Amino acid sequence: MGLFTVTKKATTPFDGQKPGTSGLRKKVTVFQQPHYLQNFVQSTFNALPVDQVRGATIVVSGDGRYFSKDAVQIITKMAAANGVRRVWVGQNSLMSTPAVSAVIRERVGADGSKATGAFILTASHNPGGPKEDFGIKYNMGNGGPAPESVTDKIFSNTTTISEYLISEDLPDVDISVVGVTSFSGPEGPFDVDVFDSSVDYIKLMKTIFDFEAIKKLLTSPKFTFCYDALHGVAGAYAKHIFVEELGADESSLLNCVPKEDFGGGHPDPNLTYAKELVERMGLGKSSSNVEPPEFGAAADGDADRNMILGKRFFVTPSDSVAIIAANAVQSIPYFASGLKGVARSMPTSAALDVVAKNLNLKFFEVPTGWKFFGNLMDAGMCSICGEESFGTGSDHIREKDGIWAVLAWLSIIAFKNKDNLGGDKLVTVEDIVRQHWATYGRHYYTRYDYENVDAGAAKELMANLVSMQSSLSDVNKLVKEIRSDVSEVVAADEFEYKDPVDGSVSKHQGIRYLFGDGSRLVFRLSGTGSVGATIRVYIEQYERDSSKTGRDSQDALAPLVDVALKLSKMQEYTGRSAPTVIT
């Protein structure tokens, strides 16, 4: 094959190419504008140390959403022009975000090469399709998202960019076929290695979990199982892991064929969007006579999030991470020698705090964004972490990992039933959660999401909540006028985090109202939507009395919900009488 050449293309900056907590997310039509994607990719190459680009190996893959295949070809041509030596691509451009992290950390090429980073093409749980969302983010050599020092540099570069490099005469690579395609350029050879990433990922999972113990559970006639990939990239792993490795019936897989538009659905694993799974698990509105499975789980578009369900029972993500942490040492071989520490994002309930205190574990509360966990893990300070937004993970990689969370839960259920598979009744998901509440108390918890709110109105609402914090006596007067049956507000602030590893400070990470009985109200503007603003309200109440841990969550939280919505003047500012999603 002849030499490919390098072309310098003149360009001008686009406004708003600032990567949020999980990269740059915009509508597909925005990314399809001439030079838009190219500007961001070149700005990223220019922000990285030279040795992480020239002669390096990078991964380019994602959740398979619409525009991914075009983007892979564009980025590959730009990588060649910028002196990258090898590009690793998941077959059909498919690679889950956790698998990308695992590949960066674990995979060794046939020539001994290791990846220094990755362009991940995903907008996670946002919808896909020609008129929906696309996203791109860069992960570093530790397998985790680029830190703010790098993303700030990328954004700065996008504001001044005047040219980018591309090898337009490099042919498109057939990414549907596994194998290495080699080219020659001005600086020597350039290879594109298309591979099935599920092989590397499964190999890693087998070093963490006891697959034989899980298989005994999944093949027991008493245990029934259902996994919903919501037509996201998790489907590319589900059959290999749950059916071929662990013996589940193929009929237990729902929506496990990855689709560019996620089947027209919203690939967000919650009670609103995972409708089919929710119905099957007996939590829907229709009354079916079919007995639900014992265990159900769902993934989002890029397979880093998870939802865990029992028969007619929802496990909150905040409870999920606490229960995994409480049971990890005895249930999961990877943690047999103990946990280094645990961490949660600030809006996540304090259920994990109580476990950490009881088990005498190091505990960290961090801002929203997985990179904060990554720092702690790189420093050997944290083993298990989670966030209320359906993200759970451990230090095996530097991303949250939806399939890992499912395998963790299956490991716990298998351990609790190891002497019981021949008995009359299994210890169920609900049993495990209720046992946990009896031991540690229950954190009643809910989240209200107001999506696509006018950005100006959202900012005004948040500013008002901050200004009110200057006088707690005034706040308490208002609170008592709204509801006399809630505790007193004892502290209120904007959450600020000083990273114990690198000393960096993250300000304005959410507005908190803390009550004397351990209850909390938290308000945040989310950075992951592509249009308008999303206001998230987190409402939490701690109940230590085990005789009171069985109440309906929304009933238990009704007084605090009333306070949250009236104190913030939610309807007044947003015009919304109800949230878009309640979790």
From Swiss-Prot:
EC identifiers of the protein: 5.4.2.2
What's one Pfam family here?
Answer: PGM_PMM_II
Q: Which UniProt keywords apply?
A: Carbohydrate metabolism, Cytoplasm, Glucose metabolism, Isomerase, Magnesium, Metal-binding, Phosphoprotein
Annotated alpha-D-glucose 1,6-bisphosphate binding sites: R25, S124, D304, R305, T368, E387, S389, K400
Where mainly located?
Answer: cytoplasm
Biological role stated in the UniProt entry: Catalyzes the reversible isomerization of alpha-D-glucose 1-phosphate to alpha-D-glucose 6-phosphate. The mechanism proceeds via the intermediate compound alpha-D-glucose 1,6-bisphosphate. This enzyme participates in both the breakdown and synthesis of glucose.
Which family is it part of? Belongs to the phosphohexose mutase family.
Protein's name according to its UniProt entry: Phosphoglucomutase, cytoplasmic 1
